[in-house]
Amino acid sequence: MELTFLGTSAGVPTRTRNMTSIILNLQQPTRAEMWLFDCGEGTQHQFLHTPYHPGKLNKIFITHLHGDHLFGLPGLLCSRSMQGNSLPLTLYGPKGLKEFVETALRLSGSWTDYPLTIIEVGPGLVFDEEGYRVTAYPLSHPVECYGYRIEQHDKPGTLDAAQLIADGVPPGPLFHQLKRGQRVTLEDGRVIDGSRYLGPATPGKTLAIFGDTAPCPQALEMARGADVMVHETTLEQAMAEKANSRGHSSSQQTAALAKEAGVGTLIATHFSSRYDAEGCLKMLAECREIFANTLLAEDFMVYKMA
């Protein structure tokens, strides 16, 4: 699991920070997948500065319908079509996403030449398939807003092939079934339980990507035990009251959540345009006073989940 931050600004862009968008590059059991979280204005332009291409996207998750998280979506969808891409794309987001996309395409005389599916989510399970479970959590913001918790399925333990051969199981297609912990029947009638030949499973990674939010109980539930938490840090601690009144979080409120939830790493992002590089570093220092393992997201920063 690898994150690439395409935009880390809140509200409006700055000279060094674009609007919110994050690529999640996944290595699936049978194929690679690429997901996008939010699509602020200029996202497709940010792609040009990365090794990735919008045509390779499989899924796009929108946290809420505020423009700084959404206004880059129609252009990206149309460009993807103009480039002759036929890979199906699924959009996930709150109620109103389908109407927004269909209206933008209709009024601009645009269309997509690839299968486009739009799924409006509610609180709870979004899907559990192909190695990953995604759950949407409602957050505290002036409009309907969600965070997404991505849980990687545990990886099966190593198959003890040497022991299987020693027990008279011939190498071949049966090993694939045994690797999944299944039972197989040999030609001689013996039943072999694959789980007995597997080493310990490797726990999957958990990633929590938040939309905009003021502190709320659901945030703790969403973040609990995550290996990585990506969370907005819109304003410095001295402006916490102002941040909360607008459905946002301050630096130390975000850090306190990371600490209470027991996350491994906090990546702070979504900084107000009032802050230059020095101002963002000040907020990073405020976060680290409470939660030491905090990173400051920057446009085009890449973070690999080990």
Swiss-Prot record:
Its cofactor is Zn(2+). It comes from the Bacteria. Pfam families: Lactamase_B_2 (PF12706). Zn(2+) 1 binds at residues 64, 66, 141, 212. Its EC number is 3.1.-.-. It is an enzyme of class 3 (hydrolase). Keywords: Endonuclease, Exonuclease, Hydrolase, Metal-binding, Nuclease, tRNA processing, Zinc. Zinc phosphodiesterase, which has both exoribonuclease and endoribonuclease activities. Binds 2 Zn(2+) ions. One of its GO terms (molecular function) is exonuclease activity. Zn(2+) 2 binds at residues 68-69, 212, 270. Gene3D superfamilies: Ribonuclease Z/Hydroxyacylglutathione hydrolase-like (3.60.15.10). The active site is at residue 68. Coiled coil: none annotated. Belongs to the RNase Z family. RNase BN subfamily. Homodimer. This is Ribonuclease BN. InterPro entries: Metallo-B-lactamas (IPR001279), RibonucZ/Hydroxyglut_hydro (IPR036866), RNase_Z/BN (IPR013471).
